[in-house]
Each structure stands twice: as structure tokens, then as C-alpha cells.
A protein has these predicted regions:
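Charged, gly/pro-rich active-site loop segments
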Residues: 1-48, 117-177
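Short, conserved active-site entrance elements at the starts or edges of catalytic domains
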Residues: 37-69
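Short beta-strand segments
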Residues: 60-94, 110-113, 121-124
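Short beta-strand segments in beta-sandwich/barrel cores
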Residues: 63, 88, 108, 129-130, ...
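Short acidic (Asp/Glu) patches
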Residues: 94-96, 106-111, 139-149
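Short, surface-exposed beta-strand-loop junctions and turns on beta-sheet-rich folds
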Residues: 96-98, 175-176
């Protein structure tokens, strides 16, 4: 087993079934609206189930966030993230470039990947985003636990993504692992 497939960090109890149901429904709706090329690239037998999505996203703590610079050029950077209240939340330092990017183009994409070749898996999420200065205390606590108990006092801003699309892909060996 690859080292990236470790146990999830301890976190407050979350209604795993509710999260799994939300993610599964979001993915189903995304594929219903997707074109034939996307449906062919992500065949049903390679998609994660709602339960697999919930477990995977709880276990993975970092994503690649893609935004658009004010001048239209692409920008990507790794970020800590948490799923909370049917949204994805990114704690962000005060002077992070993505703050200006989201204010200019309020949309983000997240890519959460692991493994290689026969054991790789990916979740792609995109949707409108907004910049916030305050978040629920539960979210701060969850995110600190996901950050291995490290403080997130550095988070001057939070980006909240309300996902409109979610696609997943998992090779058979990943699904069997």
C-alpha cells in the first residue's frame, strides 16, 4: 500500500452518511449534466461511491486549488481544505494571491489526487467561491484537527466553494485497496 493511503486524522464526529449522500448526489447530478467526452473519460465503474468519496475527502487534507488571475492567466497552488456544511473551505493567509483572484473571478477548482498508474484516484470539484473573514468555530476546530492539531491562526481569510460539479475516478486496484 502506498504511504499516501494512511488513516484519517481524528476529527469531530461528522454524520458520515449525510456527507456521503450529499457527495454522491452531487456527483450523480454532475455526470447527468456532463457531455459525452467527460462521461467516457470517467466511466461509471471507475467512479467512487458516495461512501468512498466521503472517506477519501476526510482522509486527504490537501488539494490543488486552481483560480484565474485578474488578467485571465491560470494559477494553481496547494491548500489545506475541509468539507463542511455542503461546501469546501480553504483557510488562506492574508496576502495570498488567490484572494484577489477569487474577488476578480469568483470561481475555484479543486483537484485531490493520490497514487500512480493502477492505484491512482482523483476527485475534481469546481464551483463559485467567495472570500470570508469569519467562519463557524466548528469549522476552525475541524480544520485544525485536519492540520494535525496545528494552529490555523494564520488563516486571515477563508475561501468557501459551493460545488456545482464533482467528478471522481478510481482505478480498480485503488478501489480494491
Amino acid at each position: 500500500m502506498s504511504s499516501s493511503r494512511r488513516e484519517p486524522p481524528e476529527a469531530p464526529s461528522i454524520d458520515h452518511l449525510v456527507v456521503a449522500d450529499w457527495l454522491g448526489q452531487l456527483q450523480d447530478a454532475s455526470f447527468d449534466r456532463a457531455g459525452p467526452a467527460v462521461r467516457k473519460a470517467y466511466p461509471p465503474q471507475r467512479r467512487m461511491t458516495g461512501q468512498q468519496l466521503a472517506s477519501y475527502l476526510l482522509r486527504r487534507t490537501y488539494a490543488l486549488a486552481s483560480s484565474t488571475r485578474p488578467d485571465g492567466r491560470a494559477h494553481a497552488a496547494p491548500t489545506l481544505f475541509s468539507a463542511y456544511a455542503e461546501a469546501f473551505w480553504l483557510p488562506t493567509v492574508k496576502d495570498a494571491a488567490r484572494i484577489a483572484h477569487v474577488r476578480a473571478h469568483p470561481w475555484l477548482a479543486l483537484s485531490i489526487l493520490e497514487g500512480e498508474h493502477d492505484t491512482h484516484a482523483a476527485v475534481l470539484i469546481e464551483g463559485p467561491a467567495e472570500v470570508l473573514t469569519t467562519v463557524p468555530e466548528d469549522l476552525r476546530h475541524i480544520t485544525e484537527l485536519r492540520n494535525r492539531g496545528g494552529t490555523i491562526a494564520w488563516a486571515a481569510y477563508w475561501l468557501r466553494i459551493t460545488p456545482q460539479r464533482l467528478f471522481s475516478f478510481a482505478e480498480h486496484a485503488w478501489q480494491e485497496g
